[in-house]
Amino acid sequence: EGLKTTDALPGEFPYLRGTKKNNNEWFVRQEIKVESPEAANAKALDILNKGVDSLSFHVKAKELSAEYIETLLKDICAECIELNFSTCQGHVVELAQLLVGYFQKKDYDLTKLQGSINYDYFNKMLAKGKEKGDMVATAKALIEATAMLPKYRVLNVNALTLNNAGAYIYQELGYALAWGNE
């Protein structure tokens, strides 16, 4: 009783009901592990017709090329859905450059495209105990490569590994905030 937060509307402090004032729509995302770009594209087109409006492709770094991206995204309208990608942390800049090149070739309005390229340096260190390259240099190159995609998120914090390792929710949140601060 007496809590003012129960009267808060979306878009109002303390943002308990989200930040969207006009609607509270969320993306429905499907993750696809890409074994072959043709099969992943067929699966993506099938699930897009079933209501999914966000795709997440886990691509193999060794196979990245302009043809690979073109085959993977064939007949998918990048302006109509959210596209998310993850690959080996050492190849995220290459992936970003290939995506920007593909989007420019298809004459998309780059300011309208939404999505992400998963670069989470700390998660790799936590999960594998290995550092892969220079974090600052890679992050800078990735941000520069995606500068023309203002609605693409490229620096991520994936705290799920902590949860899977047995962390409580408050520990997971605390570490995630600390990583974000780093």
Residue ranges of model-derived segments:
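Catalytic alpha/beta active-site cores
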Residues: 1-182
